[in-house]
Amino acid sequence: MPARIWNPPGHWRLLAFLLLVVLVAIAFQGFATHTIGPSSEPAGSATAPLANARPILAARGSKLVSVQPPAGRRIALTFDDGPYPVVTPLLLQTLRDLRVPATFFLIGRDAEQYPDLTRAIAAGGHEIADHTLTHPDLDRLSDAAVAGELRDGAASLERIAPDPAERRLFRPPHGRFTVATLRAAQSAGFDTILWSDDPGDWRDVTADALRDHVLAHAVAPEIVLLHSGRQATVAALPEVVDRFRRAGYTFVTVGALLRRSSAEQLNRPAKVALGG
């Protein structure tokens, strides 16, 4: 008897097609909102940033950033959240001892709670940037709510520590954003900043593990995602700074990095092998 080939009725073929359409739509939504991949809540109060985030810069007008050619390797250390009354002063002292400027993406409500610490960050020559007012997942908010978080967060920081440079940098909490998020930031005059390396200090990692990760994943130019409430991060900084300097890097703020790097360099950083 010849083999029988099952030919599904028309309604089954239609259902299969519709299922495929739904699956494709779900996948597209995940990529569009940057929510596909590991983004679960780790132990503690921190939330995991997106695993494969890269510096994404929302345009002002028709440009992302200036296109001046870079001179040498540059690295920007960025610290999210806070400020915090115990660890942030230790972090500021360490950065002062190392003569390293950094960019702090502060939460507006936390800055209001600790205004003296916020002013100390600015007085130390560091760049203060917007990390929203209350640290929500922006990809779950309406366009109006996103704009409000950016506007109110920036206003809180400006009241406490006015920025003479008037540069407006913004990082979405947990790295979660949609196209609408970027448009809202652009409309408000913000450059949206992610990172080239996330060593995972939002988890309970040791200083040695953090150091090893940063050194193994070096690129140029470099934007490193760190957090201002982690003692392991503070402990890892002296050796990290020393190794990068020996490899020819200059430590700058994100604002300085944007002024000296092209959009192509920022979104496609070159891998660098650091010497021992």
Per-region residue spans from a language model:
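N-terminal pre-catalytic segment of deacetylase/amide-hydrolase enzymes
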Residues: M1-L77, Y84-L98, E239-R243, A247-G276
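Active-site beta->alpha N-cap acidic-glycine motif
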Residues: G44-R167, R259
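Active-site beta-loop-alpha junctions enriched in small/polar residues
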Residues: G82, I107-R109, L133, P173-G175, ...
